Amino acid sequence: ARETRDAELKSGLYTYGGETVEKWQLYQSKLREVLAGVNTYWLDKPLQTAFQQRHTVTLEGGDEALRYRMYVGYNSSPGVMKDSKRDVLTGSLDFQYRLKKVLLKNSITLDNSVANESPWGSFSEYTRLNPYLRPYGENGEIQKRLDNFEGVGGESSYLNPMYNTTFNSKDQSKNFTVRELFKVEYNPTNELRFEGAFNLSKSVGHRDIFRPAQHTLFDNVTDPTLRGDYRRSQSEAVNWGIDLTGSWNKQLEDHYL
């Protein structure tokens, strides 16, 4: 904090364009905070220690003619920013049936994901905050305004990005995908092989963003009817494909055709 204040003084922040009472008062207010021991490390405020969790259950069985496999998996991935995370639940069911020279395979997979963005804002906001600023007020509450450089021709109000965590806001994305793959293999002879595959997938998703009127984004909006917003976007996609292949392999002495 002391180094930051000294750098501002040496750069002429409080003397550029001539000394004034406002500039001197502003400098004294920063000096008092430094002498009081304020030395906030802003870079760790929005960060969290993230531990990823994975859980899976697999069940397989069958005989030579019919085989099956069931799978359920859950993956929880917290983000580096506080209160950000992504949860993915996956389930799949696979069948394989062999009848003489024909092999049938079918696989169905379901994916459901929920992602929450952090209400703590972007990390770059915290890199611009000076260590002599107090994030909390006298009663321990998170302050909305941190600083005022209006006296030296700067911003009239520096907002605290932590303030947006004191109320309910939302930035959440949900996506659901179903995929099916059906495959047929036919071997009329040992040398001849035909394969056909059909795949189909459909995904739907939406994103909800809600920011109430007290959000710092609307601090400069004077019309109260324009403060706060809610946005919802939706997406849907369907994809399919067909693959047909044939192959013939024949060994003639030491050569393959």
Where are the predicted features?
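A surface-exposed, glycine/aromatic-enriched loop/edge motif typical of exported proteins
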Residues: A1-K23, D111-G153, I209
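Flexible hinge/switch segments at interdomain interfaces of large molecular machines
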Residues: R32-A36, E155, L159, T216-F218
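Outer-membrane beta-barrel channels and translocator barrels
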Residues: Q52, D63-E64, R98-V102, N187-T189, ...
